[in-house]
Amino acid sequence: MKTVYEPPHKNVIYGGGGLIGQMRPLSYMTQILKRKGYNQYGWGLGDHSYICLNEQLQYIPNTPIQYPACIRDFDLLGIRDDYKELRSVVKNVSWVPCASCMHKAFDVQYNIETEVVFFSHSTLPLNIVHGMPQETWNYPHLMNDESDFNKVIRHLASGEVIVTNSYHGAYWGTLLGRKVIAFPWCSKFWGFRHKPVLCKPQEWLQQIKTPTTYPEAKEESREANINFYYKIIERIGNDKKL
């Protein structure tokens, strides 16, 4: 039997992304560490339960999510999915979206340079999708494997409308105050508090006039992260300020 890693400190923080869902090892780890007396906190975790395996379709309808029992193993769980029913049942859960909202790049004022920009998941490139409108290739494109964060943000901000199959592309575009159209190839897309227009890739041009903006999104996201930070600091007895 493999030995499970035991952190050297009693407070463990799990950060980021779709760690809750199929084929995720999170529940195994949280249960063991809970039995060993660790305090566990989840920051910006989220659903990743259902996936569309058809790379041509890249669309999954809104599906009821069943969260695993391991979410009760956390002393505090900040989850990026905005499901009020979950928070009403599991009291240790609060809405905490990705902490990348704190980055100073979102405080810069960017000029809109083009009507549309595309931001694609590197494992789901749009050039493999049949039936995409010809107009798709008339606009700037960037992949989510770009390592320069500021370049990514400048690219997203340069468009009036962002078309993407990247979860974070949709999230960051919303924080920038842009209109967003996203292709929900995974159930995680349906958990956004500030929802983009969700459609099949072939339908993006039909939806071009549909998106709205959420001017409150950046401040709501930052406030949620700051409040969660102080909750954790209070729990672990560290009074260090931001």
Describe the predicted segments one by one.
Residues M1-L242:
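Active-site anion-handling motifs in enzyme catalytic cores
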